[in-house]
């Protein structure tokens, strides 16, 4: 991340994508090329990706749809943890089984229609479970990624108290 010159509070995020799927004939046929790629970030390990298997991709690596849902889930997590820390809610465990629904059009395009986050949060014994639940709404309102999409991102949190 870098600050955007001349724009207060603006940040640039850079990724370099390299396609590794030329099997010798480029994209001369739909079935004749691989879908693997690498995403490179300065100072970080490469991320290997491919298309979803339904689009002839490799099921053993990440696809853009997986990463898209994960970006919404992880942004919510980080927003939520910050709010909890500031509100003196001690989170001791957090898991999310997020699911995104993408619908394809007859012309081959498509879009995500919804993503549902299902965070299971454990707070320290004696913590305010109602407040912990309410902070999910605020986390959603402050999540940069959720604020950038044009479809509903629902949140169905479960709050438990630790021992």
Residue ranges and their predicted role:
Residues 1-70, 81-163:
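Extended beta-strand/beta-hairpin segments
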């Amino acid at each position: 991340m870098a600050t955007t010159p001349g724009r207060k509070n603006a940040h640039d995020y850079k990724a370099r994508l390299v396609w590794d799927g030329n099997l010798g004939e480029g994209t001369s046929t739909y079935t004749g090329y691989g879908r693997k790629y690498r995403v490179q970030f300065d100072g970080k390990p490469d991320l290997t990706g491919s298309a979803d298997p339904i689009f002839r991709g490799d099921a053993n690596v990440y696809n853009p749809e997986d990463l898209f849902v994960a970006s919404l889930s992880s942004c919510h997590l980080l927003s939520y943890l910050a709010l909890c820390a500031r509100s003196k809610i001690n989170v001791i465990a957090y898991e999310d089984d997020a699911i995104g629904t993408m619908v394809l059009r007859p012309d081959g395009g498509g879009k995500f229609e919804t993503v549902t986050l299902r965070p299971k949060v454990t707070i320290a014994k004696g913590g305010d479970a109602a407040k912990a639940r309410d902070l999910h709404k605020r986390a959603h309102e402050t999540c940069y990624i959720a604020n950038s999409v044009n479809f509903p991102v629902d949140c169905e949190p479960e709050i438990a108290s630790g021992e």
